[in-house]
Amino acid sequence: MYHLGVPTGAGDHMFVVRDEHHQTAIQKLKDSGFTQAPPDRRAAPEIMEFLPDPQAVFDEINKGYERLDRYCTSFQFPPRLPFSGDQIFLIPNSFAHLPLDNLGIPSNLSSQMAQPKQYEVYGNLFYPLEAALVESFVKGVVHDIEEVGYSSWQLLLNAWISMMRGYLEVNDDILDNCADERTAQYGGWDLRVSKRLGSGKEMPVDMRGNTIS
């Protein structure tokens, strides 16, 4: 989202690869000095030290990302790299659901065809544009609801969708051409700004600055 203009601030590094390349990518990261490690979602040490049972809290946090962790592989950056201390998630596309239309053609034509529609292409890196990224997030929500019912990962995906709606002015019709009916019907996002919708304390403008009638 950051490359599209959404001020994400901080977060983990996430790379999506085709399923058939997933194990090869894992090995290449290991060969480059990356250490396979479970996701580190602990709160700051000054918070953890005051918890009566920090491990129980940590386990409860991870429970909300159970489906993500089951499909993905996480690594620690090696100390020699600028992002030392950060983590990277390697995600198979069967989980991410990024559209792969026009990507199975020769590389000299791939960037020309994929860039205007779905991706910005830099060498062998494909940065998803708005439609591809929203489709990926929405499919993630739909599949998460089907498999686990409710999760922190689902809430995070919805938050990302909301940020794209606000900062990039992505509209409900961005999914109209999606072949997956459940994804195409997803929408009706609320643009009101409040921590508690329905409390009567919503701001008089939506997240785009438009007056709410």
For each predicted feature, which ranges?
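Catalytic cores of NTP-dependent nucleotidyl/adenyl transfer enzymes across multiple folds
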Residues: 51, 56-213
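Generic structural motif recognizing short loop/turn segments at the entrances and edges of beta-strands
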Residues: 11-13, 32, 46, 71, ...
